[in-house]
Amino acid sequence: MEEGASERSKLIVNEAQNANKGGWITVPFIIGSMLGQGLALTGAMGNLVVYLIKEYNFKAVDAAQIGNIVQGCTSLAPLAGAVVSDAFFGCYPVVVFSAIVSFVSLILFTLTAAFRSLQPPPCASISDACVPSAGQLAFLYTAVGLMVVGSGGTQFNMLTFGAYQFDSVGDRDVFFNWSIVVMYAVSIIGSTSIVFVEDSISWALGFGVSAAANAIAVVLVLLGSKHYRRPAACGSPFTGLARVAVAAIRKWDVVVAEDDSKYAHGTSEFEESINLRPSQRFSFLNRAAWICHGDTRPDGSIAKPWSLCTVQQVEDFKSLLRIFPLWSASILLSVSIGIQLILTVLQALTMDRSLGPRFSIPAGSMVVSSLVSTVVSLLLLDRLILPLWQKLSPHPPRPLRRIGLGHIINTAGIAASALVERKRASIVRSHQPESQHGDWVVPMTELWLVLPLAVTGVADALHFPGQVALYFQAFPRSLKSTATGMMALIIALGFYLSAAMVDMSRRVTGWLQDDINGSKVENVYWLVAGLTLVNFGYYVLCAKLYE
């Protein structure tokens, strides 16, 4: 009770301090900072695989694995940043600190490109003299690590911080819409303009532009400081969930009766939870809320929080267990996206990237095809398909169906990548090996790679928003802000596991070699397509059980 009273008093003081702050005056500072941070992150991370191959003489598959691991870290870091903000420091200090860390990271990236002493010497074939030294790798990995830390405190925290500036749900929705537009816009701009500068002009200039964008982001977020509402840290809701598991284990031998008066309810900001009855789903957890001797004080408050939880906490934990199978079905979906993106970059490096006599499309910019497809698909869904659906049916399309359709189209996109690779490999085989020197370009335009990525982009427009909507509906009220963060965890696991799958394909099957033209990339794509098809069956089963 004392702990709860203390937290409520902190909230009251914090609300009084923030009463005359916030609103639309804060949006230019927050959105502008998001724009700068997004450009900085995309400029540094979007072309990392190519940077490792061209400037650090990494083998293609090794660079692809490192790229996937780093992408996984930058995807997982925002979830850790959100927990740190909620539990310890609040959003604003974490946002400012992380933005400064990102800036330092980009300064280090710029130095690696500007000074040849921080890179191995260039050479036509890999030899001991071409391998980067331990010091050079340490400097590079420090820059990468700082960028991961910086991304962890800015991406989702900026959304939470911005939403806190508004009282109206409508205003928050408008802010979220603009934030999503900015996120996609910076991804497209960073993956084209900054990557083009890095590939065609100078790596140092490209990283320098990213550093400048990051510096502007830091200045903007600081300039608006006097206008912000600053949410205070109120403790992590995950502690209550952990208590449920511990309490249920401790009371594994307790016999629970039908007497509702023996369940702990406590006080809650949600009035209906005071008299909430424990459900029979996962009934073995109900004993965590069963009052035993010594669990409560004379005034009825909980004396042993790791032995007794409220019914609301137990039901919150159950809701997470119920959604977990559906969440797990999305992991392989993310794995397939990670593999397709990284293999597409490796394919593009071998293909004809010229677009006219003077322009060449950077290999790292191929991801834009998927981003543009996603944006166009979202606009069509929002402005055409969903309004038409509402006219024909009184019920909006359920998230589960939207996610399921995304699964199917994603499999089609991976299969399309396999067919494009079959054509590319056949062209490689049709040319004599002696004509394939080190800089030999496959006489096939890389625009062939656009179609599979566009199909996958349509799938992303269906299953990603569908998952966010599903998690927001299914998660307990105390974890609504964490619900959208679960997507970060899915993306992170997808990149980690895709790196592991690439390594398995190289070590076990031999399908992937250092020379992509001598590899059997088509087989990898067909394997992934088959796995995603099986995973769709698993998703359908989970959806049936969930409903």
Give short role names for the model-derived ranges:
Residues 126-127:
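Beta-strand-rich luminal/extracellular ectodomains of secretory-pathway glycoproteins
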Residues 2-121, 130-547:
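Hydrophobic transmembrane alpha-helices of multi-pass solute transporters/permeases
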